[in-house]
Amino acid sequence: MRSLSWVCLAATLCSSAVHAGGVGLGATRMIYSADAKQSTLQVRNTHAQASFLIQSWMENANGKRTQDFVITPPLYVLKPATESVVKIIFNGKSLPQDRESLYWITVKAIPQQTKNSAGNSLQFASANRIKVFYRPASLPNNANEASQKITGEYSAGKVVLSNPTPWFITTINLKVDGKAVKPVMLPPKSSTTLEETFSRATSLTFQTINDYGAWTPVTRAPLKRK
């Protein structure tokens, strides 16, 4: 029987800084300061023997590939047990200066081709995708205090969270009256309605993820009734 060549692409979105036995990133999120010439992201190959072809690209908030940033190198080979740095350079597109803008960077790793006992080619690709926040230079230097500004309101079975700050706020361990609900990312200067419906709701607790990827202390806030 003629040997069959096949490629299995398994896209794995990793939130951890290092992917054991393969390729991982040195951060779980990036802050791109507008006054910086560039930002860098460390890429690590923890495999002792395999080399990987690394391909990187940027996406906008809607998940569409964008040329708003230049990535260099966009394609290269990462040898076993080595590290490299990907540079991200903003191209100067006009963006809002009173709030952050959200992008994503995807780093795809394609290993060197191997063959199984039947002679078939095996190739597994993985992709790490993290948020990139473009931060205008005009914003104040107290982003890590943003969680204290979140307010909540309860009306007609729904809870609405408001973020009056210029920063994106990513919540974790979000609870309404002690009941865990799906965490949300709150865009700057906007309101977000939680998916769940509640028969009653009086209080809110949550943590957020700061600029360094760490969890902030638990914040407690009452829910206003409309």
Regions found by a protein language model. Name each.
Residues 2-9:
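Sec-dependent signal peptide recognition
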Residues 15-17:
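N-terminal signal peptide c-region/cleavage motif recognized by signal peptidases
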Residues 20-43, 142-151:
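Beta-sheet-dominated interaction scaffolds and their linkers
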Residues 39-45, 88, 103-107, 158-162:
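Buried hydrophobic-core signal for structured, non-transmembrane domains
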Residues 66-95, 178-203:
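Intrinsically disordered, low-complexity Pro/Gly/Ser/Thr-rich segments with frequent PxxP/GP/PP motifs
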